[in-house]
């Protein structure tokens, strides 16, 4: 699925550039009825080659992580991030066309990161750290620093991703081993903390008799008063 999504973005961009078209009017135009269609179409539209290239790799990596580790909810996470974030961008963002898949990307990154945090599993926390390692700099994208960057899309995508991570925290991830909990059984003996027992040797003969060739060896209990001077190893 991530590969097909990335391929579709490149095909649409190639059509736009090849035929000299301008798809930017299919982005989200906040608080305009004509801009509502952008909630559906805006993730497919990119301003230039750099914009598209910057979004392609995160779609492949984060999309693969989502599908591999959370296949049960992957589709719902993508669609919810796509549409809910898009609606809030239409409601609250600046009155310009907002285009690009970065809102969905921020949603996936936030979902993957906070899924590990909320579940408190080491294996899933490794995914969170992986996301931070690759895309930790994305955090700055939710602030209005660059005027031509839709930080509103980034912000709402991240917010939706966090909410979804909390909502689906009870869904078991795939390909990640569940924590193993060992339960005590009633008939199972507890490990003994007593020190190792030592051996004592009893010679069943009178001092005046000739010693037997092989003495009898018994295990001494704690109640017996005699102990040998050496541990049996």
Specify the residue positions occupied by each region the protein language model found:
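A detector for small-residue-rich transmembrane helices and their helix-helix packing motifs
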Residues: 1-206, 224-228
């Amino acid at each position: 699925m991530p590969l097909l999504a990335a391929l579709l973005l490149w095909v649409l961009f190639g059509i736009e550039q090849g035929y000299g078209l301008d798809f930017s009017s299919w982005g989200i135009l906040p608080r305009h009825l004509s801009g509502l269609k952008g909630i559906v179409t805006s993730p497919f539209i990119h301003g230039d080659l750099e914009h598209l290239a910057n979004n392609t790799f995160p779609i492949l990596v984060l999309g693969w992580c989502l599908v591999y580790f959370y296949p049960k909810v992957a589709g719902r996470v993508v669609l919810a991030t796509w549409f809910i974030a898009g609606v809030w961008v239409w409601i609250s963002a600046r009155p310009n066309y907002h285009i690009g898949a970065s809102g969905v990307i921020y949603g996936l990154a936030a979902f993957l990161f906070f899924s590990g945090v909320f579940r408190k599993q080491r294996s899933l926390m490794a995914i969170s750290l992986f996301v931070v390692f690759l895309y930790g700099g994305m955090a700055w994208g939710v602030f209005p620093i660059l005027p031509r960057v839709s930080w509103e899309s980034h912000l709402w995508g991240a917010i939706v991703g966090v909410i979804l991570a909390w909502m689906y925290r009870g869904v078991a991830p795939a390909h990640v081993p569940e924590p193993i909990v060992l339960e005590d059984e009633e008939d199972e003996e507890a490990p003994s903390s007593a020190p190792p027992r030592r051996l004592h040797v009893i010679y069943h003969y009178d001092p005046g008799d000739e010693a037997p060739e092989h003495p009898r060896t018994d295990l001494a209990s704690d109640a017996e008063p005699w102990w040998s001077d050496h541990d049996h190893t």
